[in-house]
């Protein structure tokens, strides 16, 4: 694929010392996102999604290119992924859609055992007071797809007692993790289902309804 070759050509040219700086890596990936994305597609995606998404930019970078970029970052990170943890923090602060998608892939695939880190704790600390459902589900789905266990009951209850955005994230985790075959106690599900959602929020209402349906099947 031409766009993948273009990305490979771009990455080959990078100085290996770039991996020592999360700031330089953040600049590098921002430069890499548009590779292989036609300008008209970029403009169309931005015009269509920007107003309601909460993202600072949307370029339309294909998922496969983001995965290739994440693989290159992890492969060249050396013996520790601590710089990549700092990069994840920078990506969330910049908050382009490609930033959040790349952060999700990185978060799911870093060596958390070696660093003594917990991906769910990192995600909780990364999110902004207002986030789109898309940005949260990108991360939740990526962690579950990578076979990461869902948050513990204690972590889930902490989310439930937190700010609204964290409460809403706990609902999404229950739903997505249940679809991936994980089981939660009835007590925990009842606690999470007691969360109040904004009137007229059709997405969260549907998620609540689907959780109820899934519970009825067990």
What role is predicted for each listed range?
Residues 1-218:
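Alpha-helical scaffold domains
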